[in-house]
Regions:
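Boundary/entry segment of secreted carbohydrate-active catalytic domains
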Residues: 1-14
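N-terminal glycine-rich anion-binding loops that anchor highly charged ligand groups
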Residues: 13-27
Length: 114
């Protein structure tokens, strides 16, 4: 079965968001900076989404630098090109910090059920 990933417009769910989430072809939601005021609000939003459809994939494009949608109360991850520059002179160090950065991102997102 094919599933759709949708987005929502604001900081909370409105009736039209709820109806779209309930649609059987919706399998995921991608969140953006516009959906995050602070960590507490974001957690409430995720809880409200999970109440509608528990097994929904909730995603975010959050890899560091300007591609870090959630900023306040999240670790500031440098842009990935920094790791590439380090890699040119010290491959082992670059791999280590890239892996650690990935773990930080994963832990912070998992902590809020993403």
């Amino acid at each position: 079965m094919t599933c759709l990933m949708i987005d929502i417009e604001g900081l909370g769910l409105i009736d039209s968001d709820i109806e779209r989430i309930k649609h059987p072809l919706v399998g995921g939601i991608i969140l953006f900076a516009r959906n995050c005021q602070d960590r507490s609000q974001l957690i409430k939003l995720i809880i409200s989404i999970r109440k509608i459809k528990q097994d929904l994939l909730i995603a975010v494009d959050h890899e560091g630098g300007r591609v870090q949608r959630f900023k306040d109360e999240f670790t500031n991850i440098p842009k990935m090109s920094i790791f590439g520059k380090i890699y040119q002179t010290d491959k082992k160090l670059a791999n280590k910090i890239a892996k650690l950065s990935g773990w930080v991102i994963a832990e912070e997102l998992a902590a809020i059920d993403i």
